[in-house]
Amino acid sequence: MSQSSAPAVTDAIYDASSLGRPRMFLLGLQHLFAMFGATVLVPVLTGLSVSATLLFAGLGTLLFHFLSRGKVPAFLGSSFAFIAGYAAIAPNGEAELLPYACLGVACAGLLYPVLAALFRAFGAKRVMRFFPPVVTGPIVISIGLILASSAIANCQTNWLVAVIAVAVIVICNIWGRGMVKIVPILLGVAVSYAVATALGEVDFSGVAAAPWVGLPIVWDSTVFALFGPQFDSGLATTAIITIMPLAFATMIEHIGDISAIGSTCERNYIADPGLHRTLLGDGLATILASFFGAPANTTYGENTGVLALTRVFDPRVIRIAACCAIVLSFCPKFAAVIAAMPACVIGGVSLVLYGMISAVGVRNLIENQVDFQNNRNVLVAALVLVLSLGIAYSTAGAIVLELGGVTISLSGLAVGSLVGIVLNAILPGNDFEFDVSELEEAAE
């Protein structure tokens, strides 16, 4: 008598209901673990709420799936690209300044719907001429290099623990297999945290005092905390001008991520549901998260790795992971464990992460074969790098302007990004052609 065989491991599964609910739940947990290390590290680095981060990572993912018609198996986690913006406006996570940083990120999120509308109206090819790799590459490189000093400062509290964190991440990433290779950050944090605990570097008093169940939102860190007599319009303007340009780099990253997910799943998400829908979903998720004191959201490459490993491409599995993140956000005890993470652990992991941010910028230049024998390209890239880094590491750390009685501080990244975009637009010889067909072919 013939029997129906179960799907082979190498077979792509687009309807996970055939696996049964228990296995779907386990697959969802796997995606949760994949995004976990990087997602919870961002609030630790910026001073934002870990619980709010998990809540709006889950809600943002569900919103993204709704706006993209539930077709793209993408998880939205915390974006590292905006850490430099938080550091510029609210250094060391100063509580009274975090709402201004969140306002800047929310305004950056507004650029996503604008770009989505432009993509819809004019097509990606025309719009992307203003954001070629010769501009976005150096911006991304600058983000990582500007953050490097904070990573070193954290490592100096205990270099042994920091080096262990780096070593675990490198070993897992290079020689790991299966899920070990996909979650190196999570494993690096776990191992170095355990070593730091053994060395007496961790204070668990906050964990003992934290309740098991509680609300995840810290209202003093939200944009709503700005509505009062203490509102500083100059600082708000500074935050917006400083952080908004970072959105251009993250939007380029988004396009690459959607292409990679499509290639992995053998589906053309560039065409259906379309970049205008995925950008809109990502942008609105970022705006929602920022208003309530959580980091900006972005599509996660770690979850793309899980898709490639499991060959289960059902978006419902990602939505299970999102729901698990939401449930976990209501446990302050868990958030306290993350908040107790010592600086040396954060520093070790940050060394790798910030370096990878800059390396992504370099890869962007190489993959797009930017011609640096062309003086035009050299000038654009040089000014972006020197202005971004030079101003950031100057004594003032920013350019201070007085406009109509309002004091505005422009960070190095803001100045470098704006100068790069303007120079690219006005200098002759802009021959960059955004090849939509290549993205579509990769997804087909």
Task: Describe the residue ranges of each PLM region.
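Hydrophobic, membrane-embedded alpha-helices of multi-pass small-molecule transporters
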Residues: P22-A38, V161-A165, V183-P184, L215-D257, ...
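Intrinsically disordered, low-complexity non-transmembrane regions of multi-pass membrane transporters
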Residues: M1-L26, F204-G228, S263-I270, A425-E444
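Membrane-embedded alpha-helical modules
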Residues: E96-G206, A322-S437
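Interfacial segments of multi-pass membrane proteins
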Residues: Y86-G93, N173, N303-I318, C324-S329
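Membrane-embedded helical hairpins/re-entrant loop segments and their flanking transmembrane helices
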Residues: I13-P22, V44-H65, K71, T242-P315, ...
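Short, non-helical or kinked segments that cap or interrupt transmembrane helices
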Residues: L48-T53, G70-F82, V127-T136, K181-L186, ...
